[in-house]
Curated annotation (Swiss-Prot):
GO-annotated biological processes: peptide biosynthetic process
Location(s) in or outside the cell: Cytoplasm
Stated name of the protein: Elongation factor P
GO molecular function term, any single one: translation elongation factor activity
Length: 187
């Protein structure tokens, strides 16, 4: 693993620090009038999700870790574990459902997700940015309500509530952004 200087840390870098794997979330490079320059780094632990603020001087060396990204096809869920298949080797692997966090309801059968591995350990999973969902319940449009830009709540088939424009009705398919968990467009 390559070592990098403290001033080379960028957001998104994965670092091995204090016997753990940390993702740099926010990096501020500071050059005070007195003393040496340093990087103030906000980090998130990839194994337990805890946060840490750390200061690295320019001369400090830190291990930068490269995660292996693999496309995996979701097959089914079994007792809180997601069973996925590697799209290249067709090998089946079980992953904890917690890897997806609050985006778990958007996972659909046959969907391809990107899983990040470090030494055969799955640390993170990412859904496609846009997913098609069906609206099962929403309010009817009230005449004259569309004078200003307005939204109404809608319940999706996966149990998630999103705000949609008034022209979208029940039993319609919409595209939802899985990163922001917001309505994107009609499908």
């Amino acid at each position: 693993m390559p070592k990098i200087n403290g001033n080379e840390i960028r957001p998104g870098n994965v670092l091995e620090h204090n016997d753990g794997l940390w993702a740099a979330v926010k990096v501020d490079h500071v050059k005070p009038g007195k003393g040496g320059a340093f990087a103030q780094v906000e980090m998130r632990n990839l194994r337990n999700g805890s946060k840490l603020n750390e200061r690295f001087r320019s001369a400090d060396k830190v291990e930068r870790v490269r995660l292996e990204q693999k496309d995996q096809q979701f097959l089914y869920e079994d007792a809180g574990m997601l069973v996925v298949m590697d799209t290249e080797t067709y090998e089946q692997v079980q992953l904890p459902a917690e890897l997806l966090g609050e985006r778990r309801p958007f996972l659909q059968d046959g969907m391809t997700i990107v899983v990040e591995f470090y030494e055969e350990e799955a640390l993170n999973a990412t859904l496609p940015q846009k997913v098609v969902c069906k609206i099962v319940e929403t309010e009817a449009v009230v005449k004259g309500q569309t004078a200003a830009k307005s939204f109404k709540p809608a319940l999706l088939e996966n149990g998630v509530k999103v705000m949609v424009p008034p022209f979208v009705g029940q039993d319609e398919n919409i595209v939802v952004n899985t990163e922001t968990m917001e309505y994107s467009e009609r499908a």
